[in-house]
Amino acid sequence: MRKPVGAIEIVLAPGEVVFETRPARLRTLLGSCVAITFWHPQQHIGGMCHFMLPHRPHKHKALDGRYGDEALEMLIRHALANHTKPRDYQVKLFGGGQMFPEQQNDSQQLNVADLNVHAALAMAERHRLQLKAQDMGRTGHRTIIFDLWDGNVWVKHQPIEVTEKDAR
């Protein structure tokens, strides 16, 4: 579907959560961060978050979109505020790319990208969300473009090539 006349374009920075009820194109650039898209196929409303870490070490009263659990809670609250049920949204997950694959981690310790991927999947399951697609993990960054008028998400993945020299 073509971009509707008057559709707005919003670029999300890390830690931002956006929910729109008007035609909009949402964009973000992800490395080890994860984006969650929410789209209601009947209402053509939804949003996206760009979280940096799975959760905050210490709880705080105000929600903060930098943390996955809180960013998802913000999206759920927006859905409820628009008289819709979170389980009626199509949910897609993106990101969690290794940005420094040449740095070998201790096998007992997960890195931020892996923690974000595991957290996103666990949160989707815990909230019984309708997970329609995912493109997470591997190396490199992703450009995400999410069109609210039709629910399409476009992903451009730029992997990082690791040479033998880098792996040392």
Curated annotation (Swiss-Prot):
Enzyme class, spelled out: hydrolase
Reaction catalysed by this enzyme: L-glutaminyl-[protein] + H2O = L-glutamyl-[protein] + NH4(+)
EC number: 3.5.1.44
NCBIfam families recorded: PRK13498.1 (NF010020)
Keyword tags: Chemotaxis, Hydrolase
The UniProt record lists the keyword Hydrolase: yes
Record family assignment: Belongs to the CheD family.
UniProt keyword Hydrolase present: yes
Function in brief: Probably deamidates glutamine residues to glutamate on methyl-accepting chemotaxis receptors (MCPs), playing an important role in chemotaxis.
GO biological process: chemotaxis
InterPro entries reported in the protein's UniProt record: CheD-like_sf (IPR038592), Chemorcpt_Glu_NH3ase_CheD (IPR005659), Cytotoxic_necrot_fac-like_cat (IPR011324)
Gene3D superfamilies the UniProt entry points to: 3.30.1330.200
Protein name: Probable chemoreceptor glutamine deamidase CheD
Any matching Pfam family: CheD
Gene Ontology MF term list: protein-glutamine glutaminase activity
Lineage: Bacteria, Pseudomonadati, Pseudomonadota, Gammaproteobacteria, Pseudomonadales
Species for this entry: Pseudomonas syringae pv. tomato (strain ATCC BAA-871 / DC3000)
